Amino acid sequence: LRLNRRDEIGSLVHAFGAMARRLKILEERNLDASPLTGLPGNLAIEREIENRLTAKKTFSLCHVDLDNFKPFVDMYGYAWVSEVIKEVARLLLAQMKTAEAPEDFLGHIGGDDFVIISAPLRAERICREIVAGFDGRIRKFYAAQDRERGFFIGKDRQGNQQKFPLITVTIAIITDDGARFGTPLDMAEAAAPLKEYAKTLPG
């Protein structure tokens, strides 16, 4: 009986310890959360990547970025842009929930940049669904005339008027099991050229 009691106490201690660790992580995420989207911010993202690399288990890091975003900001203003960012966050969250994988992670780097961490096959599926659903969610934020034309007229960096395409989304995916990359920065640096290349592709 004494042994059983000890086992029960040991199990409770372990359970409370695990609960305390989870609460600490949640607290850190809340403190670091984006005020706009409520998603975990840069510190939580960095910690999540570090944990995955340390675990030596294969995962995919997906960097989500919006194209033609700066001209949209200049044309429509920051208040309206904030609504677009929140809508993008809702789209990403919806696809993450559809995947039904609580171990997956979604973070907001800031501005129009987001991060998804998931298992490789699931990450690819999530990203495909995000791309497929993106246009339908974003077009409503344009004026009817711009929506119908498929572009809007704004000013470039030199102040010249020109046509700008509607916002699209680019997602760069990097996969590792801790063998190639040692730090979150290593992964981010590897994702950057992939993202820039993807932005040059049509569609």
Go through the PLM ranges and name each one.
Residues 24-28, 97, 135, 139-146:
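Two-component transmitter module helix at the DHp-CA junction of histidine kinases
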Residues 23-42, 74, 78:
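Amphipathic HAMP/coiled-coil signal-transducing linker helices
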Residues 49-60, 64, 75, 94-105, ...:
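Nucleotide second-messenger and two-component phosphorelay signaling modules
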Residues 41-60, 70-97, 107-111, 115, ...:
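Conserved long alpha-helical elements within nucleotide-processing catalytic cores of c-di-GMP signaling
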Residues 108, 142-193:
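A short glycine-enriched loop-to-beta-strand structural element that forms part of the catalytic core
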Residues 14-28, 132:
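Polar/charged heptad-repeat coiled-coil helices used as signal-transmission/dimerization stalks
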